Amino acid sequence: MKAFGPPHEGPLQGLVASRIETYGGRHRASAQSTAGRLYPRGYPVLDPSRRRLQQYVPFARGSGQARGLSPMRLRDPEPEKRHGGHVGAGLLHSPKLKELTKAHELEVRLHTFSMFGMPRLPPEDRRHWEIGEGGDSGLTIEKSWRELVPGHKEMSQELCHQQEALWELLTTELIYVRKLKIMTDLLAAGLLNLQRVGLLMEVSAETLFGNVPSLIRTHRSFWDEVLGPTLEETRASGQPLDPIGLQSGFLTFGQRFHPYVQYCLRVKQTMAYAREQQETNPLFHAFVQWCEKHKRSGRQMLCDLLIKPHQRITKYPLLLHAVLKRSPEARAQEALNAMIEAVESFLRHINGQVRQGEEQESLAAAAQRIGPYEVLEPPSDEVEKNLRPFSTLDLTSPMLGVASEHTRQLLLEGPVRVKEGREGKLDVYLFLFSDVLLVTKPQRKADKAKVIRPPLMLEKLVCQPLRDPNSFLLIHLTEFQCVSSALLVHCPSPTDRAQWLEKTQQAQAALQKLKAEEYVQQKRELLTLYRDQDRESPSTRPSTPSLEGSQSSAEGRTPEFSTIIPHLVVTEDTDEDAPLVPDDTSDSGYGTLIPGTPTGSRSPLSRLRQRALRRDPRLTFSTLELRDIPLRPHPPDPQAPQRRSAPELPEGILKGGSLPQEDPPTWSEEEDGASERGNVVVETLHRARLRGQLPSSPTHADSAGESPWESSGEEEEEGPLFLKAGHTSLRPMRAEDMLREIREELASQRIEGAEEPRDSRPRKLTRAQLQRMRGPHIIQLDTPLSASEV
C-alpha cells in the first residue's frame, strides 16, 4: 500500500491533503525549538521518522482542548525538568514511550479527520471497499407512501395496511444499506488511512469487516433491479405498490444474496476478533470510540454493526409475511407465498452451511485430542519404518457412503475398563463418533490420547448387554459377518452402560439412514443423467432400461449373451452425397459366408441386404428407435415361452454351420419380404461371430422383425443365397415363425413408461443428428445386449 507521509515529507495530493499540509506547516518553524526542549545540548536526537511527533506538540498543548480534542493526552515532553536531570538513553527506546508516541500521533490524526474529513484513499481501495462520492444518489425515498398515491384517502383500510407493510420493506432496506456504509466509509476508511501512516498495522481490515463490500453491491443491485423499479412505477402512475412486481426478484433470492453465506459463516469469528482487539489493543479501542462518537455513525456500536447483516437476512420472511397477511387478492397471495418459500429455502441453506461449519470446527477440536496411532507393536525398527506411513488416523476425512454435507461428530466419550481375551482389564478412554468407535489410552505427559486398537466401524459393530449391570460386549464383524475382535467393556455405573448402549444404537440408526439416503440420491442422479443423454441424442445412444427391467431381462438371457459389450463406431464420411446405408464392400462381416465369392462381385446376399435395408429402416435405426416401430398384431402363441431373448434356430445353425444347399424355393409375393429378412438374421449372427462379438455356438439370436412396409414389387428374383455341400434341407422352422417370435421379444423388451409411436413412417434424421453421426465417435454400451441390438 502506498505510504502516507507526514506533512513535511513532500507535497500531498488532494484538497484535504493540502489542508493537512498547510495546517501542519504552521508549526515547522517551532520544530527545532521543540526538539531543543526535548533533547538538550549533547543529548542524542531522534531520527526524522521519530521526530514526526514533535511537530504536533504545540498543537496538542496549545489549542487542542479548545478545538474539542479528545481528553487523551501525552505525558509532559520535558521529563528532565521534573526529575532534575537528564533522561537515560534507554528510555527513548522503551516500549512504553513508543506506545505513548503512537497514542499521541493517533490523537492528532483523528482530530485532523474530525476537522477536515476523511482523506481520500487510492482508487483501487475505494473500489474494493465501495467507498465513493455519489454512489448512493439513487437510494432515496419519500417519507410516506401517501405522497406517491393521491387517492389513498379512498383506499380500504386493508389495502392501506398492505401499503404500510410494503413501505416498511422499502424503507428498512435503505436504512440497512446506510448502516453498511458506516462500516466502509467511516470505520474501514479511517483504519486504512491510519495504516498508511504506520498506525494500527496489526489490525486486519479484511478480517474485521469480511465481505461487507460484497453485501453493499448485492443490496444496490437488488434495489436497482427489484425494489427501485416498483417504487418508480408507483411514482409515475400514482397507483399503490404492487407486491406481484417483486416476485421475479425474490424468486432468485438465493442467487442474488449468495455473499451472505460467506458472511454468516464468519460472523462469529469476526465479532470475536473485534472484541479481542478492543480488549488488548488500546489504540484500536481509542479509534473505535472515536468512530462510535462520530456524527456519521449515529451512535452505532461496532458489534451492533457487525451483526446487522445476520439480522437483516433473517428479517425478509417476516416482512413478506406481514405483506401476505394484509393482501386479500388470491394472485398476490400466491406470488407472496412463492417469494417466502424462496427466501426461507435460502435461509435453510445458510443454516445448513453454518451448522456444517460448526461441526467441522468441533471435529477439528476433537481430532486435536487424538494423538498417535499405535495399534501394533513392531518387532523391529525396519518393520516400524514400513508401518509408519500407515499409522496416521485422519478423523477429518469424509464419512464413507454418506453425502459430503454431513460431518463426523463426537457423540460420546468417557473412561471405561476393557478386557480382551484372557488378558487383564485395561483402563481406556472411548470416543464414539458418528461412524466409528475409538479405543484410546490417555497419556500422562500430553493432553492427547493414543489410539491402541484399530477403529471399530459402527456398521460392523454389535453391542450385547451382559448380566453384569455395568458391562456389555463389543463385537466387531468382518465383511463376511464373522467375528473380527471382541471387547468386554466395564462401565463405572449402570447409568453409563445404558448411555453407551443407547448412543451407539442411535448412531448406528442415523448412519444407516444417511447411507440409504445417499444411495437413493445417487440412483436418481444416475437415472436423470441417462434420461438427459437419451434426450440429447436419441439416434445414436442406446436406450437405458430401468433397474427392474434390466434385472428381469438379464435373468432370461443366456450367459453367453450377457457378456457381450458391443462398441458402436461412427466414422466420418467426407462425401456429402454418399448414401447413408453402407455397401457390402466396406463391411468385413458380409460376404464371408461364401468363400468363393469374388471381392468385387455382387452376391445375391448383397442385393438381398440392400433391398431389406430399403424396405425396413429398423435395420439401420438405433436400439431406442427400434422400440418405437409399430408392430403388426399377431395372435400370441400359448406354447411359446413368455420371455425369450431370441428365437431358436435350426440345428444346423446351432452347430455353427450355415443354411443347407438347396434349390431356390418358390414363394409368393407375401412371403418374399419375410423370407429374405429371415436370411438377414442368420447373416447378422454370422457376421457378429466373425467379428469376435459372439461365441462360436450361440443358442439364441434376435433380429429386427418383419417390416411393416409393403414390398414395392420392383425387386428382382434372387437365386440361392447359402451354398454349402453336405447339408440336407431343414423345413420345420419357417422364416415367418422366426420373425413372429422376434416381434414378441422386441415387444416384451419395451421400456416401461415409453411413449407409444405416433407414426408408422420411418423417422428422418435432422441435419444436427447427421453432423453428429459424421464425426468420429466411439460409444461403449454399458448394458448387455442381444444379437438384435448389436
Curated annotation (Swiss-Prot):
Instruction: Please give the residue ranges the record annotates as the region Disordered.
Output: 63-91, 529-677, 690-730, 748-790
State which tissues express it: Highest expression in the placenta. Low levels in small intestine, lung, liver, kidney, thymus and heart.
Which UniProt key words apply to this protein?
A: Cell projection, Cytoplasm, Cytoskeleton, GTPase activation
> Where found in the cell?
Cell projection, Microvillus; Cytoplasm, Cytoskeleton, Spindle; Cytoplasm, Cytoskeleton, Spindle pole; Cleavage furrow
Q: Which GO terms describe its molecular function?
A: GTPase activator activity; guanyl-nucleotide exchange factor activity
**Record flagged with keyword Membrane:** no
Q: Which InterPro entries match?
A: DBL_dom_sf, DH_dom, PH-like_dom_sf, PH_domain, PLEKHG6
Annotated ranges, domain DH: 161-353
SMART domains from the entry?
PH (SM00233), RhoGEF (SM00325)
Keyword match Cytoplasm: yes
Domain PH, chain residue ranges per copy: 409-509
Looking up SUPFAM superfamilies in the UniProt record yields: DBL homology domain (DH-domain), PH domain-like
Alphabetical list of CDD domains matching this protein = PH_PLEKHG5_G6 (cd13244), RhoGEF (cd00160)
Transmembrane regions listed in the UniProt entry? none
Q: Which GO terms describe its biological process?
A: regulation of small GTPase mediated signal transduction
Q: What does this protein do?
A: Guanine nucleotide exchange factor activating the small GTPase RHOA, which, in turn, induces myosin filament formation. Also activates RHOG. Does not activate RAC1, or to a much lower extent than RHOA and RHOG. Part of a functional unit, involving PLEKHG6, MYH10 and RHOA, at the cleavage furrow to advance furrow ingression during cytokinesis. In epithelial cells, required for the formation of microvilli and membrane ruffles on the apical pole. Along with EZR, required for normal macropinocytosis.
Q: How does it assemble?
A: Interacts with MYH10. Interacts with ELMO1 and EZR (in an open conformation). Interacts with CSPP1.
Q: What is this protein called?
A: Pleckstrin homology domain-containing family G member 6
Organism listed in the record: Homo sapiens
